Amino acid sequence: MWSPLILPLLAQIFACAFGDAVNEGCNVDPKGIHGLWYLDEPFGVYLSAIYNGSLAYIMMKERVPAIVTTVINSLEQDNDEIVQKYGVESQEELHRIVDSLKSLKTELSTNQPLTNLPLAHDEADRDAAVWNEHLDRQREIEGPNLSYFFTRFLLAESYTFRKMAHAFALAKNVRNFDFFGKQKEHLLTNSAKSLPILAHRALLEANRSKATKDEMREELAKFLKLSLWGNRFDLAASSGHEITQAGDPIELLSSFDEDLLIDHTRVAWDILNKPHGPNDPVIVDIVLDNAGYELFNDLCLATFLVSRGLATKVRFHAKQIPWYVSDVNIHDFHWVIGYMRSSSDPHLKEFGDLCARQLESGSWSVEADAFWTTFHGYGEMKKQAPVLYNTLSEATLLIFKGDLNYRKLLGDLNWEHTTSLDTALFHLDFKPTNVLSLRTIKARRVRRSYARDAASCGRRTRRRWATGRTGVIVASAKNAQCACAKSR
């Protein structure tokens, strides 16, 4: 359905990039990038930094280079500490990595073509060859000038983070060093005062002997909203600068309601509360976003789901490599639980022990598939990662956290604002099961057909689109005839 719109766009992009004269609709960036369009993305096209009025442009021009700079600075500042941990041979590796990241920043800021990843001599970086195959295929579609500002935003942004990780993958001693690790740990420790409050609430619900349906529905809504608003703690959106949560997050929940543009918590309740056979497992998959404070809230939600019998198993999906600054990897997941278990606060320690038991018993699991660190939208999952797609199809509810997951659900296309998530997923052929997206808005894509009037909602939020202050809890039931699909 998109080719009539995309192919002319690609032709115009090619003309802007390679034409002898500046074409109508094209211009030169003040800092020297020729061929940008001084307008927002048209509807029906992939998001791209070629549009000077877009968030994609801001991200690729300012925030992503700032993230690369932050990593360079932290490596130089922590050089002695890293060498002490990984050995004297890591010194030269760090120098090479810093040089590589500086080159990456230059390539990015000057809109150079994306190059294939050099292959390692072992299996430590297995998906590099897969990335190169996809890059070659994309060049066949877009042409040889597959550059940061002219290609799809999702490809350019993901490639930048993948290339940062690749600089370490080519090393021997610091191969497993998480260059975002300290920042992710600070996301939790900076919110230390709020953690015992949340842990206490999760424990109360886990140990509660009896609750009415109405009480359970209200508590589910609270834990979903806590998980949502924890998504404000996104280091990629803040260019890697630290963020702090203070105060009682439960008491603050009601004050955030005016910022919740779409609230489908009732749909989630109806999906999970449907009758199931005694031997039918109720699996909830959570595709994680940020480590630290947000992950802590996700653990609270998962504890509530299992302890109240709304799920028999929760499967967490993390990343294999450092990704988008604060995304959760397997180490981050276990680190948070270990942090709680070693705490002197009794509620925090008890909650950490409970989380560990849920992992040991099999009520929880944490997994990481290479697909999560590609540039593919989720409409491509069935073809690119069929095993993962089939695994997700086993779930009763599939929860996606954060802005990047939301963009991938929509194929990183600029849909009309009134397009429902149901419509987008139908056209992109992604419907493994019931889907719930918890996302604070850091871009301009929000499906508003179930929210307030789209025009007034747009006026109200335009200045806040990229701030993460507003959010959505939006559902798409697999069976549109199901009663849960009508409860929005």
Curated annotation (Swiss-Prot):
Signal peptide boundaries: 1-19
Needed co-factor(s): Mn(2+); Ni(2+)
Primary location group: secreted
Binding of substrate, residues: 289-290, 403-407, 442
GO cellular component: extracellular region; nucleus
Record note on modification: Automethylated.
Keyword Metal-binding appears in the UniProt entry: yes
One Pfam family from the record: ARMT1-like_dom
Subcellular location: Secreted
Family matches, as InterPro entries: ARMT-1-like_metal-bd_sf, ARMT1, ARMT1-like_metal-bd
Residues annotated for Mn(2+) binding in this entry: 289-290, 327
UniProt key word DNA repair: no
Record field: catalytic activity: beta-D-fructose 1-phosphate + H2O = D-fructose + phosphate; beta-D-fructose 6-phosphate = dihydroxyacetone + D-glyceraldehyde 3-phosphate; L-glutamyl-[protein] + S-adenosyl-L-methionine = [protein]-L-glutamate 5-O-methyl ester + S-adenosyl-L-homocysteine
UniProt binding sites for S-adenosyl-L-methionine: 294, 327
Motif Subfamily III RTxK motif, chain ranges: 439-442
Ranges annotated as spanning the membrane: none
GO biological process, any: DNA damage response
Protein family per UniProt: Belongs to the damage-control phosphatase family. Sugar phosphate phosphatase III subfamily.
Main function: Metal-dependent phosphatase that shows phosphatase activity against several substrates, including fructose-1-phosphate and fructose-6-phosphate. Its preference for fructose-1-phosphate, a strong glycating agent that causes DNA damage rather than a canonical yeast metabolite, suggests a damage-control function in hexose phosphate metabolism. Has also been shown to have O-methyltransferase activity that methylates glutamate residues of target proteins to form gamma-glutamyl methyl ester residues. Possibly methylates PCNA, suggesting it is involved in the DNA damage response.
Domain writeup: Subfamily III proteins have a conserved RTxK motif about 40-50 residues from the C-terminus; the threonine may be replaced by serine or cysteine.
Name of this protein: Damage-control phosphatase ARMT1
Name of the encoding gene: vpr2
